[in-house]
A protein has these predicted regions:
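Terminal amphipathic alpha-helical/low-complexity segments used for targeting or macromolecular assembly
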Residues: 1-50, 212, 217
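A detector of tandem-repeat and repeat-rich interaction/domain scaffolds
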Residues: 51-209
Length: 217
């Protein structure tokens, strides 16, 4: 039988129609000491007793969501629905991962960013500010998505690519390599931006590929 690393305390809150309980560590593990208070979960299904995974501060995990491995949910972050956060992934700020979304590896989600639908964020990717990743979108490797950028449908952002500002990547579009898409630019259909290319301003990339050192606005 696995050793329990935390317990549900009697301190509870009502959130989204559910009762969540603050957790308290029963043992020392990682940087957590026995007796440390954590964040809030609905039940023990939400946080594994194995590994160093932890929910701290006023973070909340509920529904069928699962946090495991060495993942950390901090500040006022939320994980809900059937979402999973694992590996060494971390959620900060007021970020939210919900529905069937998965965040894993060494990925970070912070600020007021949202990852939902069946989206995946993994590798060393970072999603922050007010960025939204949803649908079946993927953000991975060392990619960063921030500002008010939206990535959705079957779009992918990876490599060392950056998507920010009010940029919008959707349909089956891809942004990768060292590419940058920003301002109000939109990449969609089967379009792609790669290598050291930059797409910005009010540019619309519809089913074509921008590569090398090209700049389009």
């Amino acid at each position: 039988m696995e050793e329990k690393k935390y317990k549900l305390t009697e301190e509870s809150i009502k959130f989204n129609g559910k009762t969540l309980y603050r957790i308290e560590s029963l043992i020392d593990f990682g940087t957590i000491k026995k007796g440390d208070k954590g964040g809030f979960i609905e039940s023990e299904r939400n946080l594994s007793h194995e590994g160093h995974a932890w929910v701290s501060d006023n973070a909340k995990v509920f529904g069928n969501a699962r946090v495991y491995g060495d993942a950390g949910i901090t500040d006022d972050a939320r994980v809900s629905g059937d979402a999973e956060v694992y590996g060494h992934a971390w959620l900060y700020g007021e970020s939210m991962v919900c529905c069937n979304a998965v965040v894993y590896g060494n990925a970070w989600v912070s600020g007021c960013a949202r990852v939902s639908g069946r989206a995946k964020v993994f590798g060393k990717a970072q999603v922050y500010d007010d960025a939204k990743i949803f649908g079946d979108a993927k953000v991975y490797d060392n990619a960063e998505v921030f500002g008010h950028a939206w990535i959705h449908d079957n779009a992918s952002v990876y490599g060392d690519a950056n998507v920010f500002g009010d940029a919008w990547i959707h349909d089956n579009a891809s942004v990768y390599g060292n590419a940058k898409v920003y301002d109000n630019a939109e990449v969609y259909e089967d379009g792609g931006v790669l290598d050291n290319a930059e797409v910005y301003g009010n540019a619309h990339i519809d089913g074509i590929w921008i590569c090398d050192d090209d700049k389009v606005q």
